[in-house]
Amino acid sequence: MLSPEVRALVKATAPVLKEHGEALTRHFYTRMLGGNPELRQLFNQGHQQSGQQQQALAAAVAAYAEHIDDPSVLLPVVERIAHKHVSLGVRAEHYAIVGKHLLASIREVLGEAATDELIDAWAAAYGQLADLLIGRERALYAAAASRDGGWTGWRAFKVVRKTPESAEITSFYLAPADGGATPDYLPGQYVSVRVYVPELGLMQPRQYSLSEAPGMPGQLRISVKREAGSPAGMVSGTLHNRINEGDVLDVSPPQGDFTLDAEDGRPVVLLSGGVGLTPMVSMLNHLTARDDGRQIRFVHACREAGVHAMKEHINALAAKRPNVRKAVFYERVGADDRRGVDYDYEGRVDLHAIRDEVILPDADYYLCGPLPFMQAQRRALADLGVAEHRIHAEVFGTGGVA
């Protein structure tokens, strides 16, 4: 437990961190990765070069300082971070390295304002946060290892099938190279996949949602969008262009806290933009495989027909099951696109226009897609009277709807 004096000192830095947080985190990453270059393989170099990683850490540090009197407010964020750390193979010993460079960066960036007393206070606060994360991650590692077919760290998987789903998205069916079993997982969870990127001279990890329902014997499926640019798209480009059937990938055990509550029986509305449909398809397939009779709505946004993935599969489920209804939005409708078959609505997703279809009593709403898409749907759901605790969200990327 932190003393009142320590909490007061840390909290007093929150305004400074909000103003100068990115300068601090840029300095921190340069310092830490310069002194520990092996850690570059843990970090998404695309996010490093775009500044996204620095922005995210700056926001997290400022939020921790602001809520130091009641860090329980941040527990949902801590849970999400812990799942990602386990997926990446972050271990307890890494926290000492981070702490060393974070405290040194605070001193070097804040200068005379970083008194010994302030550094000691931040050391105590960081220690509290590190202990919380280490404890939760230890439990997640143990759970991953104890499942039938489970493991920790990286495991070799062979690509047994590679299937294009659209002009931009390709599915990879992965089976353990050792011939062993694969573990069960929750619909909505993801794995990390690690590949060598020659242009960077590094192994690089990325997280990809499992896009099939749990229970596919001896296999896992990920569906990967080819991202543009370098280095942001280097891993997806490597998977699309260089990885073929028979090749081997490093894969982490399934993790993630964005998961379907399949047992409560409430109606489910699945809202996705672009490649954000991948966890939604896992959820939809899980529910329909169980012959779950609850009302299910599948709302999806994409730019145009060429990038519309898994269309035939979704259409078949909706045609066969009266409790499943779809609403597909195309931003650009082509001359050959058929309303009711290829798409249902033109333009961007407008929940107000389809409120009678998607606003269901006591429903749970699952959202996944680019950040602007997510923000727009959250606002619309709030305007339509959906309670905040009924909205469950996962953010994919930072760009537009794919």
Swiss-Prot record:
Key words of the record: Detoxification, FAD, Flavoprotein, Heme, Iron, Metal-binding, NAD, NADP, Oxidoreductase, Oxygen transport, Transport
Gene3D superfamilies referenced in this protein's UniProt entry, alphabetically: Globins, Nucleotide-binding domain of ferredoxin-NADP reductase (FNR) module, Translation factors
Look up the EC number in the record and give it. Answer: 1.14.12.17
Catalytic activity as recorded in UniProt: 2 nitric oxide + NADPH + 2 O2 = 2 nitrate + NADP(+) + H(+); 2 nitric oxide + NADH + 2 O2 = 2 nitrate + NAD(+) + H(+)
So where does FAD get bound? Y190, R206, Q207, Y208, S209, V395, F396, G397, T398
Give the protein's cofactors.
heme b; FAD
Q: Which Pfam family, any one of them, does this sequence belong to?
A: Globin
Domain (Globin) spans: 1-138
Q: What does the cofactor section's free text say about binding? A: Binds 1 heme b (iron(II)-protoporphyrin IX) group per subunit.
- Looking at the UniProt record, the site noted as Influences the redox potential of the prosthetic heme and FAD groups sits at K84, E394
The enzyme's main class, written as a single word, is: oxidoreductase
Return the NCBIfam families for the record.
Answer: PRK13289.1 (NF009805)
According to its UniProt record, which protein family does this protein belong to? Belongs to the globin family. Two-domain flavohemoproteins subfamily.
Q: What is this protein called?
A: Flavohemoprotein
> Which organism encodes this protein?
Bordetella parapertussis (strain 12822 / ATCC BAA-587 / NCTC 13253)
